[in-house]
Regions:
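Mature extracytoplasmic enzyme cores
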Residues: 1-174
Length: 174
């Protein structure tokens, strides 16, 4: 991507590393996920889904519900902010590996009886790894949560309506 660097007068080239450019096995993952009959099989299928990182939700006929933030997410040295380009020739900015699969955020059968996700922040400051610098604002998640908490029994039509819901919680703040 160095042709986009402009003429800075410095002998520096740019490069990019992204997990989605590595060979992966998403097709096998999707096949396994589609064939899964329980959470364990579903999660096993996710082991082959590396990029791009995704939020996955699961529900089975036995009532199991689950969520997993999944993908190969690089680990950087403490304090490294990978939002902007880094001087990749410096060893401190090399990837130190990936967040272990069994340590990726997940929720299985939460006490509240439902799962809501809308690209919102899914971990707090106690989570030992950096997942992202960019999260969706919480309003859409909060609206989904609000609707689910207020209703004990939702129909398919209720869920369709929630998909088209135009309530703007941010507007309520004003």
């Amino acid at each position: 991507i160095s042709e986009f660097a402009g003429d800075s007068g410095v002998d520096t080239v740019l490069s990019r590393r992204w997990t989605a450019l590595d060979p992966t096995a998403e097709l096998q993952a999707i096949l396994a996920i589609n064939r899964a009959t329980n959470w364990e099989e579903f999660e096993k299928g996710l082991e082959d889904f590396h990029a791009p990182a995704q939020n996955f939700v699961f529900a089975s006929l036995d009532g199991t519900i689950a969520y997993k933030a999944n993908g190969k997410i690089p680990i950087y040295e403490d304090g490294t902010d990978a939002l902007l380009p880094l001087p990749g020739w410096e060893k401190q900015y090399e990837w130190k590996g990936f967040i272990p699969f069994d340590e990726l955020p997940k929720v299985i059968n939460p006490e509240k009886g439902f799962i809501a996700t809308a690209n919102n922040r899914v971990v707090d400051e106690s989570y030992p790894y950096h997942i992202s610098n960019v999260w969706a604002q919480p309003y859409r998640y909060e609206r989904i949560y609000e609707v689910l908490v207020e209703n004990d029994s939702l129909t398919l039509d209720d869920m369709k309506a929630l998909q088209m819901d135009a309530v703007n919680l941010r507007a309520r703040e004003f």
